[in-house]
Swiss-Prot record:
The lineage of its organism: Bacteria, Pseudomonadati, Pseudomonadota, Gammaproteobacteria, Vibrionales. PROSITE patterns: IMP_DH_GMP_RED (PS00487). Belongs to the IMPDH/GMPR family. GuaC type 1 subfamily. NADP(+) binds at residues 108-131, 216-239. Keywords: Metal-binding, NADP, Oxidoreductase, Potassium. One of its GO terms (molecular function) is GMP reductase activity. This is GMP reductase. Homotetramer. Its EC number is 1.7.1.7. NCBIfam families: GMP_reduct_1, PRK05096.1. SMART domains: IMPDH. It catalyses: IMP + NH4(+) + NADP(+) = GMP + NADPH + 2 H(+). The keyword Transcription does not apply.
């Protein structure tokens, strides 16, 4: 047993220090990033925000909506191959280039991924997604997928430390997904005692990934636009959002009527709700590691994504970053004990 004494930080523990800026307007800020990925050699351009691959967020409808803003969607893995075929038939190139095909690590998952990727050459992202990215099996699976898809962009996770980021990149991942337990409907940290404060995880994992020419996704923990900006400031190349994009018309969640009001069900992908729906219930050897909540129905996602991107643009103007890629270089975080004045309640 050992204890690491260094303090680890989450988004609530810091604020940006403002810096001199020559920008006159938020409209001058360019949020588009261009990446060339290490293993696939693929070039990609877009706004590096990703809707999470949860079945009450990462829907085909969400992908169509967010692609209009240059934003990505990781499609949840519970659609059938026929569902994908119907989607590909109707989707334009811009949408197809902004989606990730999510998969688990079983042989059935591998075959399904091959079937889906064969539907269109314009599907270029594969997201290998398991809760515990420290499994040796994940490394072997990344190698298997890389061998089968040498020209596709592969994301793998989730992990929170630089050593495993390096191992996954060396195994063939272009992008590593970072985050264990920070999500709004995740209870892994409570059920297992395992986790890592998300901002520190991003800072440390970005350093490891960039040293090898890889990229990271900061996955989870964002509760507001300022948190998204902090993730980018900490070095995340992409930021994945679940709860912030849940509850919308395009989210794909179940709508529930309660006391005359409309709500949408939102749950973690290791929750009892998810396992009841997709696995026939919680297996006898495990515990559910997620919660189920009802969110007030929020209408179209377009207003929400505009608000998030507007907040990030504003961050850039405060620190003098004309482009999103400059934000991490312009970032100085200050440690704080407060974030906002809640005398009239929190912002909705």
């Amino acid at each position: 047993m050992r204890i690491e004494q260094e303090l680890k930080l989450g988004f609530k523990d810091v604020l940006f220090r403002p810096k001199r800026s020559t920008l006159k307007s938020r409209s001058q800020v360019n949020l588009t990033r261009e990446f060339t990925f290490k293993h696939s050699g693929r070039q990609w351009s877009g706004v590096p925000v990703i809707a999470a691959n949860m079945d009450s967020v990462g829907s085909f409808e969400m992908a169509k909506a967010l692609s209009q803003h240059g934003v990505m969607t990781a499609i949840h893995k519970h659609y059938t191959v026929q569902d994908w075929a119907d989607f590909v038939k109707d989707a334009d190139s811009e949408t197809l280039n902004k989606v990730m095909v999510s998969t688990g690590t079983s042989e059935a998952d591998f075959q399904k991924t091959k079937d889906v990727m064969a539907l269109s050459d314009e599907l270029i992202f594969i997201c290998i997604d398991i809760a515990n990215g420290y499994s040796e099996h994940l490394v072997q699976y990344v190698q298997q997928v890389r061998a089968a898809f040498p020209d596709k962009v592969i994301s793998a996770g989730n992990v929170v430390t630089g050593d495993m980021v390096e191992e996954l990149i060396l195994a063939g991942a272009d992008i590593v997904k970072v985050g264990i337990g920070p999500g709004s409907v995740c209870t892994t940290r409570v059920k297992t005692g395992v986790g890592y404060p998300q901002l520190s995880a991003i800072i440390e994992c970005a350093d490891a990934a960039h040293g090898l020419g890889g990229r990271i996704i900061g996955d989870g923990g964002c509760a507001c636009a300022g948190d998204v900006a902090k993730a980018f400031g900490g070095g995340a190349d992409f930021v994945m959002l679940g709860g912030m994009l849940a509850g919308h018309e395009e989210s794909g969640g179940e709508i529930v009527l309660k006391d005359g009001e409309s709500y949408m069900k939102f749950y973690g992908m290791s929750s009892k709700s998810a396992m009841d729906k997709h696995s026939g219930g919680v297996a006898g050897y495990r515990a559910a590691e997620g919660k189920t909540v009802l969110l007030p129905y929020r209408g179209s996602v377009h207003g929400t994504i505009q608000d998030i991107l507007g907040g990030v643009r504003s961050t850039c103007t405060y620190v003098g970053a004309a482009e999103l890629r400059e934000l991490t270089k312009r970032t100085t975080f200050i440690r704080v004990l407060e974030q906002e004045n809640n005398v009239f309640g929190k912002e909705k």
